[in-house]
Amino acid sequence: MIALIQRVTRASVTVEGEVTGEIGAGLLVLLGVEKDDDEQKANRLCERVLGYRIFSDAEGKMNLNVQQAGGSVLVVSQFTLAADTERGMRPSFSKGASPDRAEALYDYFVERCCQQEMNTQTGRFAADMQVSLVNDGPVTFWLQV
């Protein structure tokens, strides 16, 4: 399971002209689900995402996680993160989970974020989405479990 996390000052997701999720300061989480992923990996990745210390403390040092910084989380499904790009000119998605399995684990990940008392917003699974963000820093990390 893969999360591309970006520290943002604001972010939103629009589907068919409707805003489905919007946050101020916090994390935009692009989530990719691979074939061998399960709830245990989703738990571990959620723990890492919410605990990752990439927000500045009073001294300007990256020392706070999103909860400590009072931020929110916007989770967006992104199957392209599971692409194999090692060869050729076209990505292969053979490493990605089936749509049903990916959606179940995406929903599970979102629920785990909510259970941690995070203000959690979402996109819409498998939809054609427009994601807008202001990357703060820029600060972007690739987390994989």
UniProtKB/Swiss-Prot annotation:
It comes from the Bacteria. It catalyses: glycyl-tRNA(Ala) + H2O = tRNA(Ala) + glycine + H(+); a D-aminoacyl-tRNA + H2O = a tRNA + a D-alpha-amino acid + H(+). It is found in: Cytoplasm. Its main location: cytoplasm. InterPro entries: Daa-tRNA_deacyls_DTD, DTD-like_sf. Its EC number is 3.1.1.96. One of its GO terms (biological process) is D-amino acid catabolic process. GO terms for molecular function: D-tyrosyl-tRNA(Tyr) deacylase activity; Gly-tRNA(Ala) deacylase activity; Ser(Gly)-tRNA(Ala) hydrolase activity; tRNA binding. Keywords: Cytoplasm, Hydrolase, RNA-binding, tRNA-binding. It holds the Pfam family Tyr_Deacylase. A motif (Gly-cisPro motif, important for rejection of L-amino acids) lies at residues 137-138. This is D-aminoacyl-tRNA deacylase. A Gly-cisPro motif from one monomer fits into the active site of the other monomer to allow specific chiral rejection of L-amino acids. An aminoacyl-tRNA editing enzyme that deacylates mischarged D-aminoacyl-tRNAs. Also deacylates mischarged glycyl-tRNA(Ala), protecting cells against glycine mischarging by AlaRS. Acts via tRNA-based rather than protein-based catalysis; rejects L-amino acids rather than detecting D-amino acids in the active site. By recycling D-aminoacyl-tRNA to D-amino acids and free tRNA molecules, this enzyme counteracts the toxicity associated with the formation of D-aminoacyl-tRNA entities in vivo and helps enforce protein L-homochirality. One of its GO terms (cellular component) is cytoplasm. Transmembrane segments: none annotated. Homodimer. CDD domains: Dtyr_deacylase. Belongs to the DTD family.
